[in-house]
């Protein structure tokens, strides 16, 4: 009788251990994807430009923030959402429908890339590479390029101010 009880207990322990191993090796995570190929995303706003929204009483283009249009995009969840949003903006990807509605961008600019970013007490400093001086030009153009990046960055509540380096960027 004792041998039968011992064997029964041994079977129960082995079964419980097997079940525990399955649970431990495949935990249910409420914060991550359930399947390995599933990606967690977040929605960000990229700011593009529509000159029809940026005209004064005389129908002149004002070259102001009034022409900025936020478009929602999905990006992969990461520890660097600000940089990810700026990098996506720099790609300048608009759909045909967005272009048909009057939304434009001069991005991508050949050679322009985000080199780094730092956030200190609400001031976001963005460092760019611009080996071909593509961020220069007329005051209207460079203002809109600046506004697009600034508005895209300021959607994040921790960003209160945006600075660009080198300082030669976005100069008329």
Model-assigned labels for residue ranges:
Residues 1-172:
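Bimodal "functional hotspot" detector
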């Amino acid at each position: 009788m004792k041998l039968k009880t011992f064997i029964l207990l041994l079977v129960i322990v082995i079964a419980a251990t097997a079940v525990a191993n399955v649970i431990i090796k495949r935990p249910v995570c409420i914060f991550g994807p359930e399947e390995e190929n599933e990606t967690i995303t977040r929605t960000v706003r990229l700011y593009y430009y529509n000159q029809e929204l940026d005209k004064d009483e005389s129908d002149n283009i004002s070259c102001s923030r009034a022409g900025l249009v936020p478009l929602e995009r999905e990006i992969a969840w990461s520890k660097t959402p600000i940089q990810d949003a700026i990098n996506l903006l720099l790609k300048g990807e608009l759909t045909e429908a967005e272009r048909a509605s009057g939304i434009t961008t001069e991005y991508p600019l050949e050679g322009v890339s985000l080199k780094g970013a730092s956030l200190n007490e609400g001031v976001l400093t963005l460092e760019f590479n611009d080996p071909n001086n593509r961020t220069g030009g007329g005051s209207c153009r460079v203002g809109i390029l600046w506004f697009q990046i600034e508005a895209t960055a300021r959607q994040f509540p921790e960003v209160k101010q945006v600075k660009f380096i080198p300082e030669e960027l976005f100069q008329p």
